[in-house]
A protein has these predicted regions:
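Ser/Thr-centered flexible coil motifs
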Residues: 25-28, 49
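A conserved active-site cap/scaffold subdomain adjacent to cofactor or substrate pockets
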Residues: 44-50
Length: 221
């Protein structure tokens, strides 16, 4: 199985690709299977309807912008897959409805807020306008009846940020960006000291060590 194109993301770990570990002792078969499944996430929605899909795709792009990142973490697809599979955290704030309901209500309310102000849905707004609206959500200033009693501030913190950011950093492309080697099972991590690293960990580049770090990272397995 090929790893696809190497990441061109801006990172302090140049030329590091965690997927190079796929066939090494860093990952066991269970880890490989989990990562393969994550990389194969369907890009077409199974939970969200067409209107919700447009809204959540735009929302993900504002929470974690990836305009200059390749390859892109498919955030909306990962969220859709989680909801379609009835996966949840196993707990929730009592002021929020169940996860699937919260997302349906939240996206509908977000579009309702936008249409009330200018007649357009969230996905059709300029990015600056979208950002301003999300700022209002973060402060709990969105109170359209479409929220159905769910606090917009709580939806922002407990669903929007929690789910989208969590899904981003669950993906191997994001691991490569931050120099994370994944579960490292069964190999593990050994040199647990300040400024020490195992040979199978990524090398962080300093201002004068970019080429050295890139060379080392191409050999990391």
């Amino acid at each position: 199985m090929t790893n696809g194109p190497r990441s061109t993301r801006a990172t302090r770990y140049p030329d590091y690709d965690v997927l190079d570990k796929r066939t090494t002792p860093s990952w066991d078969e269970h880890t490989r299977a989990v990562i393969a499944d994550r990389l194969a996430t369907p890009l077409e929605p199974r939970f969200f309807n067409a209107v919700e899909w447009l809204a959540v795709t735009s929302l993900c792009a504002r929470v974690v912008p990836q305009a200059n990142a390749q390859p892109v973490v498919p955030l909306a697809a990962l969220l859709d897959a989680r909801l379609a599979g009835h996966s949840n955290d196993g707990y929730r704030d009592a002021r929020l409805p169940p996860m699937r309901d919260a997302w349906r209500i939240g996206l509908a309310a977000l579009d309702a807020e936008c249409r009330e102000r200018g007649g357009l849905p969230f996905a059709s707004l300029a990015q600056d306008t979208q950002n301003a609206l999300l700022g209002e959500m973060q402060r709990g200033e969105l109170t359209n009846p479409a929220w159905r009693g769910m606090p917009s501030k709580l939806f922002f913190s407990e669903r929007v940020l929690h789910d989208i950011c969590g899904l981003y950093y669950s993906h191997p492309h994001a691991w490569s960006e931050i120099g994370f080697g994944g579960p490292a099972n069964p190999r593990g991590y050994v040199r647990m000291y300040l400024n020490r690293r195992d040979p199978w960990e990524a090398v962080e580049a300093r201002s004068d060590t970019h080429e050295h770090a890139a060379k080392e990272n191409r050999r990391v397995r």
